[in-house]
Regions:
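Flavin (primarily FAD) cofactor-binding/catalytic cores of flavoenzymes
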Residues: 2-27, 32-51, 55-57, 86-401
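A short small-residue
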Residues: 76-80, 340-342
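A short acidic, helix-capping loop that chelates divalent metal ions and anchors anionic groups
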Residues: 80-86
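Redox-cofactor-proximal catalytic regions of oxidoreductases
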Residues: 53-78
């Protein structure tokens, strides 16, 4: 007698446990570029992304955000960004481009899937995402170093009547209370938000001077030669981990961040933004600056960056929270790769136009690794598969019998 409940459970178990040649974790620009090269190689793979929609990592930034790079540098492999050469896309336009890219190449992106744990069992990687369990010979972690908002512990002592937002939560000035605004962190996000907020509220910008680029992006000199010189030559070919100047720049970038790109000190002055020292603590519920000055504010925006956020990777590959790799290849865990990290190989590695080169490099390594495996088994090429895996696009789909 057939037990229908047993058959149903067997189908559910099969749906929740699958094997792939390669699993890509992260469906942003790094993951999609990797997917493009994997598809060209005929790989059996899937891309997992925690967001409900491709491009949401861009959509969920502040409303007025525009990219620092013009359209000519914002295309992924095989598909240029659809805009005039020196147009600076909005964050929503970038998000829509990524979505159309995945559709154009028919990449198998499974959205709404947050990975809880990556571990290893024998010669395969195991990925746990809710009740979904996947296995793979190769895993590409395709995301940036900066995943979890960083806010100093002393922020808990700030008066609860004061609005506190991290820059990842800020959308526009309508979120703020009437009264003064303190923006902590004087990098690019802090400077851009400060200039936007200052016409509406008294605004302080707290933090060290990060320096700034000595030219206007989008200006005549930038269009004539600086864009190509910086984007294609300096950031992409000169400033790499293979050169002394690149290694020095990498250390500085990872420790201090980028200089101001679009918003310059003169722009902050013109907007009425007041510069103050670092914020180091709290006194009587109000933020206190280095030197002891206390500011009375109604709002605090923490533009203090992000932590790596790789705690879900249960593998011994980290040194002070950063994955140890060589050009994205983790030698201590064969088959594990990274794409999208800040200065993974070059200054352009975390930029749209630079991520494709790193993706191509790791996919070639995956192919080489597979070829060696086949040869060790006496095969000249990968055997034909009986069927390609079909992947549901939403977590709810996987629970269907």
């Amino acid at each position: 007698m057939i037990n229908n409940n047993s058959l149903k459970e067997e189908r559910l178990t099969s749906a929740r446990s699958r094997y792939y040649d390669t699993i890509v974790i992260g469906g942003g620009q790094a993951g999609l570029a990797t997917g493009c090269y994997l598809k060209k190689q005929g790989q059996d793979f899937v891309i997992l992304d925690a967001n409900e929609r491709i491009g949401d990592a861009w959509r969920n930034r502040w409303d007025s955000l525009r990219l620092f790079t013009p359209a000519r540098f914002n295309g992924l492999p095989g598909r240029p960004f659809p805009a005039e050469t020196y147009y600076f896309p909005t964050k929503d336009e970038m998000a829509d481009y990524l979505e159309s890219y995945a559709e154009h190449f028919q990449l198998p992106v499974r959205t709404g899937t947050r990975v809880d744990r990556l571990s290893r069992r024998d010669d395969r990687f195991v990925i746990q995402a809710g009740d979904l369990k996947l296995q793979a010979d190769n895993v590409v972690v395709a995301m940036s170093n900066w995943q979890k908002p960083r806010v100093p512990a002393f922020a808990r002592g700030i008066d609860p009547e004061i609005v506190q937002l991290h820059s990842s939560e800020y959308r526009n000035p309508s979120q703020l209370r009437d009264g003064a605004v303190l923006i902590v962190g004087a990098g690019n996000s802090g400077a851009e938000i400060a200039r936007e907020v200052a016409p509406k509220y008294p605004t302080w910008l707290s933090g060290r001077d990060t320096g700034h680029l000595p030219f206007e992006i989008g200006g005549l000199a930038y269009r004539l030669f600086l864009a190509r010189l910086i984007g294609r030559v300096l950031f992409h070919r000169v400033m790499t981990v293979d050169t002394p100047i690149g290694r020095k720049a990498r250390a500085k970038l990872l420790s201090k961040g980028m200089p101001l790109v679009r918003v310059k000190p003169k722009d902050l002055d013109a907007a009425g933004v007041r510069r103050v020292p670092r914020t180091v603590g709290v006194q009587d519920g109000q933020p206190m600056l280095e030197g002891g000055r206390v500011l009375e504010v109604a709002n605090v925006i923490w533009s203090t960056g992000f932590h790596p956020g790789f705690s879900w990777i249960d593998l011994p590959i980290f040194d002070e929270g950063e994955p140890q790799h060589e050009r994205g290849v983790v030698a201590s865990e064969p088959g594990l790769y990274f794409v999208g990290l800040t200065f993974l190989y070059a200054a352009s590695s975390s930029m749209i136009h630079g991520v494709g080169r790193d993706a191509e490099y790791v996919v070639k390594d995956i192919q080489t690794r597979q070829r060696r495996s086949w040869q060790s088994e006496g095969l000249e090429r990968l055997p034909e598969r009986e069927a390609q895996h079909k992947v549901p696009s939403r977590a709810k789909d996987i629970a269907q019998p």
